[in-house]
Amino acid sequence: MAESRDAHELLLIEEADAWFEYLEATRGQGEVRYGEVEPWAWSRLRQRLRALKARRARLERQAA
């Protein structure tokens, strides 16, 4: 049970890291540069969140 809780906490930390990566990439960019960087940053964020969702689902199946 404790292992499951630790794994869940690690997934939450990874999710927060994904959001911080997005913010770091887009924050403080000029309008033109933001337009270039934001689609990449959003795509990267969505990719990381999808992977985390899949890992979370696997973790929940194992716990059941």
Question: Which residue ranges define each predicted feature?
Answer:
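Short, charge-rich amphipathic interface segments used for partner binding and complex assembly
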Residues: E24-Q62
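Short, charge/polar-rich alpha-helical segments
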Residues: M1-A16
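Face-specific signal for non-transmembrane alpha helices
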Residues: A16, E21-L23
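Short intrinsically disordered terminal tails
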Residues: M1-E3, E60-A64
